[in-house]
Regions:
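Conserved CoA-thioester-binding segment of acyl-CoA-metabolizing enzymes
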Residues: 1-54
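Well-ordered beta-strand positions
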Residues: 109-110, 148, 152-154, 166-169
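An acidic, glycine-rich surface segment that forms the CoA-thioester-binding/catalytic face
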Residues: 38, 44-45, 54-95, 134
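Hydrophobic, secondary-structure "cap" segments at the distal end of domains
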Residues: 134-144
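Intrinsically disordered, low-complexity segments enriched in small/flexible residues
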Residues: 1-7, 19-25, 50, 198-246
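C-terminal long alpha-helix characteristic of the crotonase
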Residues: 112-114, 167-213
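Glycine-rich beta-to-alpha active-site loop
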Residues: 74-126
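Terminal peptide-recognition signature
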Residues: 33, 105, 161, 196
């Protein structure tokens, strides 16, 4: 059993690119994802973590397959670990994908799909798999649209995935798109990515006054970071990134 993803450095030291088999057994995928997160955590410099998910064999659909609840628990924890990395994460998918690929796309910061991408939903005997995909779908697209997918859909065609925000960019050059995304979306240094993710997540449910304190603390941290870095490249890069985002 292969327990590590096929990992290679991104060009120009931008980060790590890992290829994951979208049709692999759940324990193997879990081990591969944990190994990738471990490597990302050991990097001393700012690192983008990019995942390139390959489609399963034609006709494969059942997810997660014949597994134990303990294996499901380990998989969900690995996806959450990816989601909470202090790195910008990019996920790319191609072909007809399902199961783990939808989990990884929803957990990533930026998502790339090829023109032939179709996301097959994790439906077994007519019932949507009740894993944390449900939770992420609701958080990502809202309960009404998530309900339509869960109760009546069997797949998400690429145009729908783009409209729902599950795919951010379409490209038939996955390698180039991943590199460009890593170059443009390297994000803030150190633990700043995680802070911004938490602020975004909490904004969906927190009251204004509750959120205000967390945002003010983040602003104070950012002012100190910019002051420490001075008017050099770091501050300029941060300002340029903010301008591009706007």
């Amino acid at each position: 059993m292969k327990t590590e993803p096929d990992r290679t450095p991104l060009p120009d030291g931008l980060g790590i690119l890992a290829r994951l088999d979208g049709g692999g057994p759940l324990p193997e995928l879990t081990a591969a994802l944990n190994a990738l997160c471990e490597e990302a955590g050991e990097q001393r410099e700012r690192t983008v973590v990019a995942l390139r998910c390959t489609p399963p064999p034609p006709g494969a659909r059942a997810w997660p397959g014949d597994v134990s609840i303990h294996e499901v628990n380990r998989w969900e924890r690995a996806v959450r670990r990816l989601e909470r990395l202090d790195n910008v994460t990019v996920a790319a998918a191609q072909g007809v994908c399902g199961g783990p690929v939808l989990d990884l796309l929803l957990a990533a910061d930026f998502r790339i799909g090829t023109p032939d991408l179709k996301l097959v939903l994790p439906v077994n005997q007519g019932q949507f798999w009740p894993g944390m995909t449900l939770y992420r779908l609701v958080r990502h697209i809202g309960p009404a649209r998530a309900r339509r997918l869960v109760l009546w859909a069997s797949d998400i065609p690429l145009p729908d995935a783009v409209e729902l925000g599950i795919v951010d960019q379409i490209s038939d050059d996955v390698t180039g798109a991943v590199r460009d995304a890593a170059l443009l979306r390297g994000g803030p240094p150190d633990g700043e990515v995680g802070i911004r993710r938490r602020l975004l997540e909490e904004a969906a449910s927190a009251e204004y006054q509750d959120a205000f304190g967390a945002h003010l603390a983040a602003c104070d941290r950012e002012l100190r970071r910019l002051r420490d870095s001075g008017p050099g490249p770091s501050a300029g890069t941060a300002a340029g990134g903010a301008g591009a985002a706007g």
